[in-house]
Amino acid sequence: MKSVEDLGDLRGKRVVIRCDFNVPLDGDKITDDGRIKAALPTLTQLHEAGARTTVLAHLGRPKGAVDPKYSLAPVAKRLGELMNLDVKLAGDVVGPSATKTSESLADGEIALVENVRFEKGETSKDEAERAELAQKYASFGEFYVSNGFGVVHRKQASVYDVAKLLPSAAGSLVAKEVEVLEGLTADPKRPFVVVLGGAKVADKLAVIDNLLKAADTLVIGGGMAYTFLKAKGLEVGDSLLDEDSIDACTKYLEQAKAAGKQILLPVDVRVVSDIDFEARTVGQIDVVPADEIPSDKMAVDIGPETEKAYANAIKGAKSVFWNGPMGVFEIKGLELGTKAVAQALTEVDGLSVVGGGDSASAVRTLGFADDQFGHISTGGGASLELMEGKELPGIAVLKENN
């Protein structure tokens, strides 16, 4: 993949950059600007190089039609504050306003067009429809920079098709993500420990398949742990259970044993009989051994003994990849397992990687700073697909364009 430096002198040149600004909003207030901050190094580089930069980005899922609640206005405002620049926002995506805004940029200026998902062609499965929209994006620049790692696993007009039309490069954010994550699966420093949590085993089957080959130890928490416990013949009460994945879990346990690898499962869990996920309230929380979960209770977090065992495995590693919380961390009293894992990652003497999505928001919610970890991925789905060994369309096209 080419870097921005490889594009040569950009002063006065028009550059189109795809960023991932899909930030959480409360009304029109951004509640976590991590993704905007992650884009700053490359945007600052373009600004200082004197490029005339048009930014493509999406927010939410407006389904191919204009929806004011998904406007990029809060993003443009926050980006301007962070860069101490006047960042203009066009009134449309590829219409007269976007064209005029892009064409009137001076050297070093930055503008956003509106949410690319306001255009039906952006996420279309019809290649011709995407290509037609990509032509319009390409009219905004002489070069294309891909800097939205959270979307590189999508074959979309602003990620994939436009990169075929212009000389293209990876921004520093995408380049670092690919380097770190591909390095973990190809040649990790050992011991290599993978921590997987989250609700469903089904979502992680391909990841487990690939990482069982690469990792020395697999640490399992979150809702998916109870399907593994069931596969070992234990009763899990009212806990989340992915019946369709029990056989797969049995197979993984057997494969790990045959290959001399460890799969760590909870030895104790926190259980409740009364929980309201919407209101984020919970009744009495008890700790029970993992093989004694009462039939009328739901396990909702790993227990203190498990926290210690998992922390020890993590702290002894030279490389750690973590994706998915250990429990319902959004509810007070059920964040302890996730917090213990996050704390252990900060103490790793080696590379600690937080794999985007819920894990990234969990560490920030729980008060950890980004620089306490080796790398926090900006892509949940993208980081998992890369760890599965899949070829990501938005990366493949940059490598071809080399």
Curated annotation (Swiss-Prot):
Residues where ATP binds: 204, 330, 356-359
Transferase among keywords: yes
Annotated catalysed reactions: (2R)-3-phosphoglycerate + ATP = (2R)-3-phospho-glyceroyl phosphate + ADP
Compartment(s): Cytoplasm
Enzyme Commission number: 2.7.2.3
Xref: PANTHER family: PHOSPHOGLYCERATE KINASE, PHOSPHOGLYCERATE KINASE 1, CHLOROPLASTIC-RELATED
Name the record gives this protein: Phosphoglycerate kinase
Organism: Cutibacterium acnes (strain DSM 16379 / KPA171202) (Propionibacterium acnes)
Lineage: Bacteria, Bacillati, Actinomycetota, Actinomycetes, Propionibacteriales
Gene label: pgk
